[in-house]
UniProtKB/Swiss-Prot annotation:
Residues 1-103 are annotated as: 1. Residues 541-668 are annotated as: 5. This is Translation initiation factor IF-2. SUPFAM superfamilies: Initiation factor IF2/eIF5b, domain 3, P-loop containing nucleoside triphosphate hydrolases, Putative DNA-binding domain, Translation proteins. Residues 288-391 are annotated as: 3. The modification N6-acetyllysine is found at K808. It comes from Escherichia coli (strain K12). Residues 423-427 are annotated as: G2. Belongs to the TRAFAC class translation factor GTPase superfamily. Classic translation factor GTPase family. IF-2 subfamily. It is found in: Cytoplasm.
Length: 890
């Protein structure tokens, strides 16, 4: 083929010269319009164009098939379901070179597999030949051994043949005798079964006839109705009575219904009709319905409600109560909901609630006291001695700074034996003094809370109250509180009018003020003695003591001196070196060192006793206060102290009290009333002030805890996370860090390890010695948690003079600011005829086409209200702001 030029080739292919030159360039051949093209170059261009325009290497075909499936539904209606099946297939175009390479690899793989197969066949043939040779040798050995065994067996068979014949003859004879006995027994059983079946059939027929006659005549059953028989045969009568008892027993006992059913394999016991009648009488048919019978009445007498005696302990779960009443737990829960209490099946309820529920459901309740062990321990005490006169126990109360402490100091310094070395070394909280007319025991600082709790627990620890009132100050709030405590305790009051030596003293005013609260002097016809004293000068102290002894003589105070002691805890605290220490006032008996005492939730052996001077004593009689050591823990102020015989029983009683206190507490906490349920649902978030409280004595802990808990409101609550007696330890600091609480120490300090934790965790630690300062600061902390009060304040008014349309904002109100200032980012209200018709915010605030943040009084502006286009001339736009006002707790 001759060479042609680019132009000629372009004319032949009917394309432009530039495109042809570009195609040659793409194929790697550089040509111009006048250059010639050889045949080799043409072939190169054709291959390049074929490769470029060869089409896609992959072809995907998709096919969808739709069909409808009818599914039968409920109510006889069918349901149509559309089903679509999608199929997808992909074809890949292989490269010729790739196809040749794959074919070569497949051929090589087939040859390798063929070679491996031939080698495997040859190896298998060799192994089979070797195995056949081994098996032939083993077979020859086995045949030789079997031949030897057969020969030996032949010899044994000949020798034992005669013995076997003898044994077979004997066995055949025994078998024949056994078969004969079995045939005889079966014949007897068949005859007896036929007789019983006939008797039962006759009895059943008689019973049916009797029932039919009874229901037809509608007659009342008589006493001899069970003795009615329809046959004269004695055996038939017995079978009839037995059948009646079985049927009636099956009706009366639902649990023994299985016993009344016919056995599965007993086909000859009764006929098919009889078996159906028995099944219908014992249990219901399919679906709970009884199978009808033409000869049996379907009426059944309703069961009478069973009233049971329900024994209820101090606590019981709902499930246990249901089991005692033999009802379902859901019925008990329903009854509790009717009474207004929500409960679950496993919830513990108290004795009163369980009693109400059981009586509501018609049962008789027997309340059981579970403290038999405690009563047994308390009754095992030798307290049968005669009562003797005892010293009075006096509590001195009064307002702050009225000279109460000075009066006590003067009495102690003058009446305590002066020969005591070191004087009063310890402040025990109670002490006794000797006078010419007798002994008096004073309670120093019981605190009002401890005083009230002792009276509430029935501990007759206080006999007389000395009310100290300053002659120059008169009756103060705490004086009134002391009078209320004395009246609640129903104890006589002796009034000591102190500071009588001051020039401004006015004892008559004190009498007049006290008379308003029911404290009348004897000269006015009352029962209270008034004594004028001066704690500073010592005036009237002897008269006060004589008045106390006179009042005690009127009361005729007596106590048993011999026997096992009992008393009350005046104060308790935890000493770092000695452990739990309790100040005990003995009420009766004599307390000895080494006695086993039971004190509330605690118990122990008295290891040491000390009097108010800090001296060791071996015994303490009635009205004597002592410190005792050796208890298992710190008891609560006001707890009863009792001496018992056995330490093991004392421990059991203490543990029982702890567990019972916990159960009763949980039962009362879990009790939720229906009327409170919706209130609890609607309550919002309640803030809590968590406090870990430590104080020097138990009385301070109780008083501070009660005062703080009374500060709680609906929005902020005070929560005492932990409290105790003694210094602040590392455990207290860790507890405060975990619960985000405030550490409060009242007359105590934190140790070194606790201070490290407090510094590391940045805890809030506060020390106090005055309870009023503590309460004020907790109030301030609670006030900070109150949500602020929101108040709306109007800051500007704008009157709409005209309304314009804007393509961007919609209706624009042309306004004149008449009052205050209009700010862009504040909420607004639209008023029409002084009625609010819209509340929202501004979208645009302009003045002379400029966006501004505020427009003041007397200036015009354009206002665009967001999401509101119904602004009219004459409307008023009110701009306001929301102010937060911090609230405080009163």
């Amino acid at each position: 083929m001759t060479d042609v030029t680019i132009k000629t080739l372009a004319a032949e292919r009917q394309t432009s010269v530039e495109r042809l030159v570009q195609q040659f360039a793409d194929a790697g051949i550089r040509k111009s319009a006048d250059d010639s093209v050889s045949a080799q170059e043409k072939q190169t261009l054709i291959d390049h164009l074929n490769q470029k325009n060869s089409g896609p290497d992959k072809l995907t075909l998709q096919r969808k098939t739709r069909s409808t499936l009818n599914i039968p539904g409920t109510g006889g209606k069918s349901k149509s379901v559309q089903i679509e099946v999608r199929k997808k297939r992909t074809f890949v175009k292989r490269d010729p070179q790739e196809a040749e390479r794959l074919a070569a690899e497949e051929q090589a793989q087939r040859e390798a597999e063929e070679q491996a197969r031939r080698e495997a066949e040859e190896s298998a043939k060799r192994e089979a030949q070797q195995k056949a040779e081994r098996e032939a040798a083993e077979q020859a050995k086995r045949e030789a051994a079997e031949q030897a065994k057969r020969e030996a067996a032949e010899k044994d068979k000949v020798s034992n043949q005669q013995d076997d014949m003898t044994k077979n003859a004997q066995a055949e004879k025994a078998r024949r005798e056994q078969e004969a006995a079995e045939l005889k027994r079966k014949a007897e059983e068949e005859a007896r079964r036929k007789l019983e079946e006939e008797a039962r059939r006759v009895a059943e027929e008689a019973r049916r006839m009797a029932e039919e006659n009874k229901w037809t005549d509608n007659a009342e059953p008589t006493e001899d109705s069970s003795d009615y028989h329809v046959t004269t045969s004695q055996h038939a009568r017995q079978a009839e009575d037995e059948s009646d008892r079985e049927v009636e027993g099956g009706r009366g006992r639902g649990r023994n219904a299985k016993a009344a059913r016919p056995k599965k394999g007993n086909k000859h016991a009764e006929s098919k009709a009889d078996r159906e009648e028995a099944r219908a009488a014992v249990r219901g048919g399919k679906g709970g319905k009884r199978k009808g019978s033409s000869l049996q009445q379907g009426f059944q007498k309703p069961a009478q409600a069973v009233n049971r005696d329900v024994v209820i302990g101090e606590t019981i779960t709902v499930g246990e109560l249901a089991n005692k009443m033999a009802v379902k737990g859901s019925q008990v829960i329903k009854a509790m909901m009717k009474l207004g209490a929500m409960a679950t099946i496993n919830q513990v309820i108290d004795q009163e609630t369980a009693q109400l529920v059981a009586e509501e459901m018609g049962h008789k309740v027997i309340l059981r006291r579970e403290n038999e062990l405690e009563e047994a321990v308390m009754s095992d005490r030798d307290t049968g001695a005669a009562a003797e006169p005892r010293a009075p126990v006096v509590t001195i109360m009064g307002h702050v700074d009225h000279g109460k402490t000075s009066l006590l100091d003067y009495i102690r310094s003058t009446k305590v034996a002066s020969g005591e070395a070191g004087g009063i070394t310890q402040h025990i909280g109670a002490y006794h003094v000797e006078t010419e007319n007798g002994m008096i025991t004073f309670l120093d600082t019981p605190g009002h809370a401890a005083f009230t709790s002792m009276r509430a627990r029935g501990a007759q620890a206080t006999d007389i109250v000395v009310l100290v009132v300053a002659a120059d100050d008169g009756v103060m709030p705490q004086t009134i509180e002391a009078i209320q405590h004395a009246k609640a305790a129903q104890v006589p009051v002796v009034v000591a009018v102190n500071k009588i030596d001051k020039p401004e003293a006015d004892p008559d005013r004190v009498k007049n003020e006290l008379s308003q609260y029911g404290i009348l002097p004897e000269e006015w016809g009352g029962e209270s003695q008034f004594v004028h004293v001066s704690a500073k000068a010592g005036t009237g102290i002897d008269e006060l003591l004589d008045a106390i002894l006179l009042q005690a003589e009127v009361l005729e105070l007596k106590a048993v001196r011999k026997g096992m002691a009992s008393g009350a805890v005046i104060e308790s605290f935890l000493d770092k070196g000695r452990g739990p220490v309790a100040t005990v006032l003995v009420r009766e008996g004599t307390l000895h060192k080494g006695d086993i005492v039971l004190c509330g939730f605690e118990y122990g052996r008295v290891r040491a006793m000390r009097n108010e001077l800090g001296q060791e004593v071996l015994e303490a009689g009635p009205s004597i206060p002592v410190e005792i050591l050796g208890l298992s823990g710190v008891p609560a102020a006001g707890d009863e102290v009792t001496v018992v015989r056995d330490e093991k029983k004392a421990r059991e009683v203490a543990l029982y009290r702890q567990g019972k206190f916990r159960e009763v507490k949980l039962a009362r906490q879990q009790k939720s009333k229906l009327e409170n349920m919706f209130a609890n649902m609607t309550e919002g978030e309640v803030h809590e002030v968590n406090i870990v409280l430590k104080a020097d004595v138990q009385g301070s802990v109780e008083a501070i805890s009660d005062s703080l808990l009374k500060l709680s409101t609906d929005e902020v609550k005070v929560k005492i996370i932990g409290s105790g007696v003694g210094g602040i330890t590392e455990t207290d600091a860790t507890l405060a860090a975990a619960s985000n609480a405030i550490l409060v120490g009242f007359n105590v300090r934190a140790d070194a390890s606790a201070r490290k934790v407090i510094e590391a965790e940045s805890l809030d630690l506060r020390y106090y010695s005055v309870i009023y300062n503590l309460i004020d600061e907790v109030k301030a902390a609670m006030s900070g948690m109150l949500s602020p009060e929101l108040k709306q304040q109007i800051i500007g008014l704008a009157e709409v003079r005209d309304v314009f349309k804007s393509p961007k904002f919609g209706a624009i109100a042309g306004c004149m600011v008449t009052e205050g200032v209009v700010k862009r980012h504040n909420p607004i209200r639209v008023l029409r005829d002084n009625v609010v018709i819209y509340e929202g915010e501004l979208e645009s605030l302009r003045r002379f086409k400029d966006d501004v943040n505020e427009v003041r009084n007397g200036m015009e502006c354009g206002i665009g209200v967001k999401n509101y286009n119904d602004v009219r001339t004459g409307d008023v736009i009110e701009v306001f702001e929301i102010i937060e006002i911090q609230r405080t707790i009163a």
